[in-house]
Structure formats: C-alpha cells, structure tokens
Amino acid sequence: MRKIILASGSPRRKELLELAGVPFEIIVSEVEETIGAYSSPSDIVMSLALQKASAVAENNSDHIVLGADTIVTYESRILGKPSNEAEAKEMLQLLSGKTHEVYTGVAIIAKDKTVTFYERTEVTFWELTEEEIDAYVASKEPLDKAGSYGIQGKGSIFVQHIQGDYYSVVGLPISRLVRELKQFNIDVTHA
C-alpha cells in the first residue's frame, strides 16, 4: 500500500492528521516560501502547497505526498509569518476589530494524479488593547504563524466570529482533505 507523506514540519498539521486517523509519515519540504506574482491568495497557497509536495514527491514517487500552505489576508495585503516581534505586533494591530481572510491550500501528489484545492475562512477579531497585543507577542506564540496568531492557542481569545472551516485556519482543512483522499483510494472513515 502506498504511504501518505506529509511534506510539512508543522506540529498543527501533524496533530490534525493524527486526530482524523490518517496514517502518514513526515518528510519536511525544504522549499523556500516565496510569494511571487500571483493573481489571487488562493493561487498563492495552492502554488506553495504544490511546490512543497512536489519537492518531496521527487524522491517518493511511489507514495502520496501532501503539501499545505496558509496565509492571512486583509484588504489585499498578505500577512505571512512575522519576521520579528515588531512585525507580529503590527499585524495584530492591523487585524484588531476587523474581519480578515485565511486561505489554506493543499496539494496531493501521487504518480498518476495531482489534486490541489483551497479553503477560505473569514475570521473577525475583537478590538484588542495594546496590553493584550504586547502580552501575546511576548508569549512568542505568534512568531511562527501566518497573520501572527494561533486560533488553537492563546490567540483564540481574540476571535469574535469565524465563518468557514476552523481547521483550515489551524493549517489543514482536514474534512475536505479526507474527502479528496478518496480519489486516491484512501478512505480513513472506515479504518
């Protein structure tokens, strides 16, 4: 049977696959995440997910490789992972009291087929005080997350409303992924 390989070192994606009962191994993709000239946020995340999966699939062509990428957008501005605490603070100030979009793209590659898709989720933040932002940034949690917050962690207290797939905001739209894996004859719902 073909193995499923997750081309990501994200502990959140690993946890979501485990929770869903998807058997997998991890081989971290070494692809540099650079955003070129794309027409839309959905194109960006699907392209980056495909680049990550393709890099790992080159040496694992007999298996199924999953790649994923997540970005946050606000008013056409792309908010990736912050490069430092000052940038994290700036992003949180920007998102305070507003609705933003989270896009997660997924690529599934096998020898005979490639599937890419994305999910878009709207997230609305409460108005945040400077003290809340400073304390959160000091916790270091936002420093490795797109948009500078983790909805599954301390950042959850900032969320007033969500419209769409919660797990996509965490980093992997697991329900959709499980359905897409059926195209590759993998059905974890009966495992």
Curated annotation (Swiss-Prot):
Cofactor(s) needed by this chain: a divalent metal cation
CDD domains named among the record's database cross-references: Maf
Single GO biological process annotation from the record: nucleotide metabolic process
Reaction catalyzed: dTTP + H2O = dTMP + diphosphate + H(+); UTP + H2O = UMP + diphosphate + H(+)
Keywords (A to Z) from UniProt: Cytoplasm, Hydrolase, Nucleotide metabolism
UniProt function note: Nucleoside triphosphate pyrophosphatase that hydrolyzes dTTP and UTP. May have a dual role in cell division arrest and in preventing the incorporation of modified nucleotides into cellular nucleic acids.
Name of this chain's protein: dTTP/UTP pyrophosphatase
Species of the source: Bacillus cereus (strain AH820)
Organism lineage: Bacteria, Bacillati, Bacillota, Bacilli, Bacillales
Gene of this entry: maf
